[in-house]
Amino acid sequence: MKNITDSFVSLGHWPSAGSFGFNTDILATNLINLSVVLGVLIFFGKGVLSDLLDNRKQRILDTIRNSEKLREGAIEQLEKARARLRKVEIEADQFRTNGYSEIEREKLNLINSTYKTLEQLENYKNETIHFEQQRTINQVRQRVFQQALQGALGTLNSCLTNELHLRTINANLGMFGAIKEITD
């Protein structure tokens, strides 16, 4: 632990011009920060992500099954409508002289309304699937971010002891004193 503390203290000193030292510019160390964050996200979020995706997949499959049941109901309605259509066609042959155009109009309206119902059910199924996918993606993103943040905070809290904290503060105070002397 003392070696780790000494390495932090030695990294805390401002290097002279042209030498190697700790870079505190967050924009210059962005690649390192990104790799650390990605590593933490992958390490802590892998299991949770797979569980969430499996749960979401099951829900989506259930939604698809429900949509298929609705579709089967619509097909059943379509068959009933076709049976009714056949009946109407038989009656049309009998009453052709009394209103052929009226019966034909009834037939077209029945077919159109059935197809519209089928289209609406298909659109509803597709919208439901898309909505569930988007909601799942958003939930997974939020959960992974929360767990990565909790893991990072836990790691920081477990690594930062009082002794290390005091040494870091003293080293920073020493640096600020040296900077103040240079600027005065």
UniProtKB/Swiss-Prot annotation:
Additional free-text comment from the UniProt record:
In plastids the F-type ATPase is also known as CF(1)CF(0).
Task: Provide the membrane topology annotation.
Answer: Single-pass membrane protein
- UniProt keyword annotations, A-Z: ATP synthesis, CF(0), Chloroplast, Hydrogen ion transport, Ion transport, Membrane, Plastid, Thylakoid, Transmembrane, Transmembrane helix, Transport
The name this protein carries in UniProt is: ATP synthase subunit b, chloroplastic
Protein purpose: F(1)F(0) ATP synthase produces ATP from ADP in the presence of a proton or sodium gradient. F-type ATPases consist of two structural domains, F(1) containing the extramembraneous catalytic core and F(0) containing the membrane proton channel, linked together by a central stalk and a peripheral stalk. During catalysis, ATP synthesis in the catalytic domain of F(1) is coupled via a rotary mechanism of the central stalk subunits to proton translocation. Component of the F(0) channel, it forms part of the peripheral stalk, linking F(1) to F(0).
Record localization: Plastid, Chloroplast thylakoid membrane
How does this chain assemble?
F-type ATPases have 2 components, F(1) - the catalytic core - and F(0) - the membrane proton channel. F(1) has five subunits: alpha(3), beta(3), gamma(1), delta(1), epsilon(1). F(0) has four main subunits: a(1), b(1), b'(1) and c(10-14). The alpha and beta chains form an alternating ring which encloses part of the gamma chain. F(1) is attached to F(0) by a central stalk formed by the gamma and epsilon chains, while a peripheral stalk is formed by the delta, b and b' chains.
Annotated transmembrane regions: 27-49
